Amino acid sequence: MARIAGINVPVKKCVPFALTYIHGIGITTANIICRSCKIDERKRVLELQDEDIEKISSFIRQKYVIEGELRKKVAMDIKSLMEIGCYRGLRHRKGLPVRGQRTHTNAKTRKGRSKLPIAGKK
């Protein structure tokens, strides 16, 4: 495993796919990073030189919010929505779908399992 931006990425995969193992970087962003650092997208992580890995790491640290920072930012955004009392914040607080999906028959995952009483032995 190679470390890019403090995250272990698989060495046998091509660089863009390996970069997607970092939380906050998808395939499109990974391709942009490869083009910006002038690294062939078909190259595997194993074939990269140390300076290439350092170039990618520094580029990611400068341009993108990743991993723990990103998780913290998303959590703070949701918390602020709940504090100001907007509709999306209320939906988050109640544990319901936020983006307008129907809840009458769907949304089982977001609402959780229903708590039915279990009948005892008669």
UniProtKB/Swiss-Prot annotation:
GO terms for cellular component: cytosol; small ribosomal subunit. One of its GO terms (molecular function) is tRNA binding. Gene3D superfamilies: 1.10.8.50, 30s ribosomal protein s13, domain 2 (4.10.910.10). The keyword Ribosomal protein applies. Keywords: Ribonucleoprotein, Ribosomal protein, RNA-binding, rRNA-binding, tRNA-binding. GO terms for biological process: translation. InterPro entries: Rbsml_uS13_C, Ribosomal_uS13, Ribosomal_uS13-like_H2TH, Ribosomal_uS13_bac-type, Ribosomal_uS13_CS. Residues 97-122 are annotated as: Disordered. It comes from the Bacteria. The keyword tRNA-binding applies. Located at the top of the head of the 30S subunit, it contacts several helices of the 16S rRNA. In the 70S ribosome it contacts the 23S rRNA (bridge B1a) and protein L5 of the 50S subunit (bridge B1b), connecting the 2 subunits; these bridges are implicated in subunit movement. Contacts the tRNAs in the A and P-sites. NCBIfam families: uS13_bact. Belongs to the universal ribosomal protein uS13 family. PANTHER family: 30S RIBOSOMAL PROTEIN S13/40S RIBOSOMAL PROTEIN S18, SMALL RIBOSOMAL SUBUNIT PROTEIN US13M. Part of the 30S ribosomal subunit. Forms a loose heterodimer with protein S19. Forms two bridges to the 50S subunit in the 70S ribosome. This is Small ribosomal subunit protein uS13.
